C-alpha cells in the first residue's frame, strides 16, 4: 500500500494490484491510516480527479481541497501507479 502523500491528518494512497482485472488509476483517502472503506478518487489520463465515492465521509470543503491537491499532483500519482504494476 504505497502512501503517496499526507494532507494534514489524511493520507492519500493506493493498494498495489487492486482487483482483477486491474482497475484504472485511482487513489484512496483516509484519516490516519488506510482502511477498506476509504474515499475513492479516479484520476483520468488528463489529470482530472473524479470522486468515485466518499465512504469515509470527509466533509465537502476538505474533500474539494484534497481533490485540487490530487489534480495538482496527478503526474506524480500516475507515475507511482505505473511503477507498481
Specify the residue positions occupied by each region the protein language model found.
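Negatively charged, low-complexity tracts enriched in Asp/Glu with abundant Ser/Thr
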Residues: 1-15
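A short, structured beta-strand/loop element
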Residues: 19-60
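Proteins with a high burden of low-complexity, intrinsically disordered sequence enriched in S/T/G/P/A and R
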Residues: 11, 24-26, 70
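Acidic, low-complexity intrinsically disordered segments
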Residues: 54-85
Amino acid at each position: 500500500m504505497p502512501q503517496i502523500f499526507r494532507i494534514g491528518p489524511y493520507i492519500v494512497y493506493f493498494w498495489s494490484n487492486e482487483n482483477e482485472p486491474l482497475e484504472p488509476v485511482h487513489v484512496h483517502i483516509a484519516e490516519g491510516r488506510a482502511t477498506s472503506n476509504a474515499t475513492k478518487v479516479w484520476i483520468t489520463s488528463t489529470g482530472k480527479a473524479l470522486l468515485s465515492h466518499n465512504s469515509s465521509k470527509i466533509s465537502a470543503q476538505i474533500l474539494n481541497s484534497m481533490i485540487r491537491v490530487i489534480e495538482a499532483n496527478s503526474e506524480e500519482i500516475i507515475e507511482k501507479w505505473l511503477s507498481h504494476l
